[in-house]
Amino acid sequence: MKNIRYIDKKDVENLIENKISDDVIIFLSGPTSQKTPLSVLRTKDIIAVNGSAQYLLSNNIVPFIYVLTDVRFLHQRRDDFYKFSQRSRYTIVNVDVYEHASKEDKLYILQNCLVLRSFYRREKGGFIKKIKFNILRQIHKELLISVPLSKKGRLVGFCKDISLGYCSCHTIAFAAIQIAYSLKYARIICSGLDLTGSCSRFYDENKNPMPSELSRDLFKILPFFRFMHDNVKDINIYNLSDDTAISYDVIPFIKLQDISAEESKDMTRKKMQYRTSTDSYAN
């Protein structure tokens, strides 16, 4: 633990400086991700998670960030992790992935990935935990968290600055959203944020099937999204999924044409900026 270098403010600033689009698409594992056209994916920064990166890479789309928070993926699909990490521009893993990695993999992670700190191991409440996070909240205004007094209750939270850490909630989507928010994207657009039925993944897992635990944990997950909606007033987030467990009053639905329309505006603005710069050189 002492030798871990966690993601810091300079890392976040570097990521912000290297963005290539105003919006970001979080490309998740839900079946509806396949409905997002490649033409749209090619125009935006992409945050890929788990095995969803394979689909992007096979279509010559390089993820801006590859995110992994599931220890099982590193253990069961190690070669894929290395491939996805090496072919993405940046990789972010949480501290659990690092701590449960082999010595060789730990070295790779420290040299090639950014490590994300988690504020807690379990979402259980309690008096001591409440005091701890009340103090942290006073020190770090970017940490929004609500901790019940009873250990039977479950805390909920959201961190606006990943250099401090992140609030986990049994789905990598929530980690990716906190990353995207920290990088100050104009719009955060979720693709494949379904969480319905058995919460199956759209990509082939014949080699190393990893049972999804999302349907079992849904009652733990949904309050975090509601908390985000109620407390992160300036977040501009949308869902492309037309089959989702998350209410559209929490994360609004967005049509593909609305993304394309904004994309056209971006292209026009960039052309105008280019013309202005060339005119200034001419003068």
Curated annotation (Swiss-Prot):
Main localization category: cytoplasm
One GO term (biological process): lipopolysaccharide core region biosynthetic process
Leader peptide range in chain numbering: none
Keyword flag Zinc-finger: no
Record-level Gene Ontology MF annotations: transferase activity
GO cellular component: cytoplasm; plasma membrane
Keywords associated with the record: Cytoplasm, Lipopolysaccharide biosynthesis, Transferase
EC numbers, comma separated: 2.4.99.15
Subcellular locations according to the entry: Cytoplasm
Catalytic activity as recorded in UniProt: an alpha-Kdo-(2->4)-alpha-Kdo-(2->6)-lipid IVA + CMP-3-deoxy-beta-D-manno-octulosonate = an alpha-Kdo-(2->4)-alpha-Kdo-(2->4)-alpha-Kdo-(2->6)-lipid IVA + CMP + H(+); alpha-Kdo-(2->4)-alpha-Kdo-(2->6)-lipid IVA (E. coli) + CMP-3-deoxy-beta-D-manno-octulosonate = alpha-Kdo-(2->4)-alpha-Kdo-(2->4)-alpha-Kdo-(2->6)-lipid IVA + CMP + H(+)
Phenotypic effect of disruption: Mutation of the gene results in changes in the LPS core but does not affect the attachment of O antigen in an E.coli strain producing the O antigen from S.dysenteriae.
Stated role: Involved in the biosynthesis of the core oligosaccharide region of lipopolysaccharide (LPS). Required for the addition of 3-deoxy-D-manno-oct-2-ulosonic acid III (KdoIII) to the KdoII residue of the inner lipopolysaccharide core. May also play a role in a lipooligosaccharide (LOS) biosynthesis pathway.
Name of this protein: Probable 3-deoxy-manno-octulosonic acid transferase
